[in-house]
Regions:
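Bacterial signal peptide processing site
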Residues: 21-23
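Active-site-proximal helices and loops of the catalytic beta/alpha 8
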Residues: 30-31, 173-175, 180, 191, ...
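C-terminal motif of bacterial Sec signal peptides marking the signal peptidase cleavage site
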Residues: 17-19
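Bacterial N-terminal signal peptides that target proteins for export
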Residues: 1-8
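Short acidic/polar active-site loop segments enriched in Thr and Asp
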Residues: 112, 274, 404
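Active-site-proximal beta-strand/loop segments in catalytic clefts of secreted hydrolases
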Residues: 52-55, 117-120, 187-190, 279-281, ...
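Substrate-binding/active-site clefts of carbohydrate-active enzymes
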Residues: 40-46, 54-271, 291-300, 304-309, ...
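Conserved, mostly hydrophobic/aromatic
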Residues: 51, 106, 116, 155, ...
């Protein structure tokens, strides 16, 4: 693209965000009653690229520790599937250096932040308890390692597979910022490691160490009901009942546990975390997250957090977003489910199926514009879409309300349709990234992601739907505040033939500029904007300036009053 949108858009973003400082992430109270905006939180301007760090790129082979584990090795550990297919439950070599080496690749695609799986230290052995995991299996941990980072033995220490002699976690975050990328850290409160049913009690499993390396808790390979917290201090970090598979169940009611965890979160902020993704948030009571968010935001008022509540019922996951429960955003699972339904078979589906999950009015969320939106991740099957299905999914994801999140490799359709132990988390690698820029999915993603990156209305604007029907979608995104005023008209076509659009509703006179092509149209008063959108295409027409349509202003106020 030769059209340069950066100067105007960044100046608007800078003015707008200047008004955002020192405000609660879930508060728009500083705005006057005439302001038209979906959300004012600073993080709304971000687009997130998600990596399972060990499976991204091996940037430093010296930290692979291929001989680690002895009789319980940790390197690769393939699961054999049909027709030569494989998945892996051991370490594959990815590290922070691998992410840093590809910072410009990620930034150039249009992303502004990288969410990485937890950096915490994990056990140095494959787990020898539980039933053995097999290709395509689930909810079994036998034979697996903590390559993913979610089995922490020390919540304050980085795993040796991720850092390098010349690249600590704080070094990494500082260098990523120099590349224009924020760092989203993955945190856990529900559990530690798999902790019981081991044939032999292996070092690290069931154990938790403090910041100084002192042992503060040990499950001692005992079933939860056999723990004796009254007489054994090392058992007091745990509930005496199970939760997820054979993982230790951390006792969030214990003040020592709460302090240990929350202080670890504050520590990682000091090491450069810009936001948190919270694992298994619904497995920990709201009271814990209220205390955690209060303590975090006391020192970091604008700190953004979003949780994984793996539930497709909006009323259930929305409870986490309420201020009384900590005001934590969530991954938008209801939209994820709808996106898979629509974009796996775009020629057979209807855009109307996405309307209800937007919850633009009468919804349960504290603010739907602050949800993190996605179509797949590492805990579910990757979307089984064609290249055009991916392209249409991205065109939707980067123009509708919410903060988009894309899982590594999606830009090339990597391992499409595969679940966790069937290839979903397979190693991506530098070679694939080096070839990615010629892939049609990556090229189309780069175009629309960079439009969002430079268009304030797509980041924060109120969404006003005009048409969601069949292969066609048309909607406005509108910002009109003291600091920024911009209207974006989004037109989507997921069909295999061109679609003509004639937009009369809420149309405003003035110059409209299409952001992907640079084409300009001047619309006179009472005229329509007429255009044709190519198959599997998107157009984003932007008008700078305050809203002049009283009908549009009234519609936005109506929606915001009923949000």
């Amino acid at each position: 693209m030769s059209f340069n949108r950066t100067v105007v858009a960044l100046s608007l973003a800078g003015v707008f965000c200047a008004a955002c400082t020192n405000t609660s992430p879930n508060s728009d109270k500083y705005l006057n009653n005439d302001a038209l905006v979906g959300t004012s939180i600073p993080f709304a301007s971000e687009a997130v690229y998600f990596v399972v760090t060990d499976r991204f790129v091996d940037g430093d082979p010296t930290n692979n520790y291929e001989d680690q584990g002895g009789d319980h090795p940790t390197w690769q550990l393939p699961l054999e599937g049909p027709e030569g297919k494989k998945a892996y439950v051991g370490y594959m070599g990815g590290d922070l250096q691998g992410i840093l080496n590809n910072a410009d690749y990620i930034k150039d695609m249009g992303f502004t932040a990288v969410w990485m799986t937890p950096v915490h230290d994990n056990p140095d052995y494959a787990f020898n308890g539980d039933e053995p995991i097999t290709y395509g299996g689930a909810f079994k941990d036998g034979g697996k390692t903590g390559y993913h980072g979610y089995w922490a033995t020390n919540f304050y220490q980085a795993d040796e597979h991720l850092v390098s002699d010349n690249l600590s976690v704080s070094d990494y975050t500082a260098k990523m910022r120099k590349h224009g990328l924020k760092s989203v850290f993955d945190i856990v409160a529900n559990h530690g490691t798999p902790s019981f049913t081991m044939e032999k009690d292996l070092p690290g499993y069931g154990e938790i160490y403090d910041k100084e390396g002192n042992l503060v808790a040990d499950h001692q390979n005992l079933a939860p009901e056999d723990l004796d917290p009254k007489n054994n201090a090392l058992h007091r970090f745990f509930h005496n009942y199970p939760d997820l598979v054979k993982l230790s169940n951390l006792d969030d009611k214990n003040p020592a546990v709460r302090d240990y965890l929350i202080n670890s979160y504050l520590y990682w902020i000091s090491q450069g975390a810009d936001a948190f993704r919270i694992d298994t948030i619904r497995h920990v009571p709201h009271a814990f997250w209220r205390e955690a968010s209060d303590r975090i935001r006391e020192q970091n008022p604008d700190f953004f957090m979003f949780g994984e509540a793996f539930d497709y019922e909006a009323n259930n996951i929305a409870q986490h977003t309420l201020p009384k429960n900590g005001g934590v955003s969530v991954l938008d699972f209801p939209m994820q489910k709808a996106m898979v339904s629509v974009f796996e078979k775009p020629l057979e589906s209807d855009f109307a199926d996405l309307e209800n999950v937007l919850y633009l009015t009468h919804g349960p969320y504290n603010n739907p514009y602050e949800l993190t939106t996605f179509y797949d991740n590492h805990d579910m099957a990757r979307i089984n879409a064609t290249d055009n299905g991916f392209i249409n999914a991205h065109n939707w994801l980067f123009t509708v309300r919410g903060i988009p999140v894309v899982y590594m490799g999606s830009e090339i359709g990597f391992m499409r349709g595969t679940a966790e132990h069937a290839g979903n988390r397979n190693y991506l690698g530098q070679k694939r990234l080096d070839q990615a820029k010629t892939h049609p999915i990556q090229q189309a993603l780069t175009n629309i992601a960079n439009v969002r990156k430079t268009t304030v209305a797509l980041q924060r604007g109120v969404q006003v739907n005009l048409e969601l029907n069949g292969h066609r979608a048309a909607f406005y995104r509108v910002v009109d505040t003291k600091g920024a005023a911009q209207t974006a008209l989004v037109l989507l076509n997921k069909g295999d033939s061109a679609e003509a659009f004639v937009i009369n509703d809420f149309m405003q006179s003035g110059e409209w500029v299409e952001q992907l092509s640079g084409q300009s149209k001047t619309v006179d008063q009472d005229d329509a904007l007429t255009t044709t959108v190519e198959p599997n295409g998107v157009q984003v027409w932007v008008r700078e300036g305050k809203v002049t349509s009283l009908a549009l202003r009234d519609q936005i106020k109506y929606q915001l009053a009923r949000q």
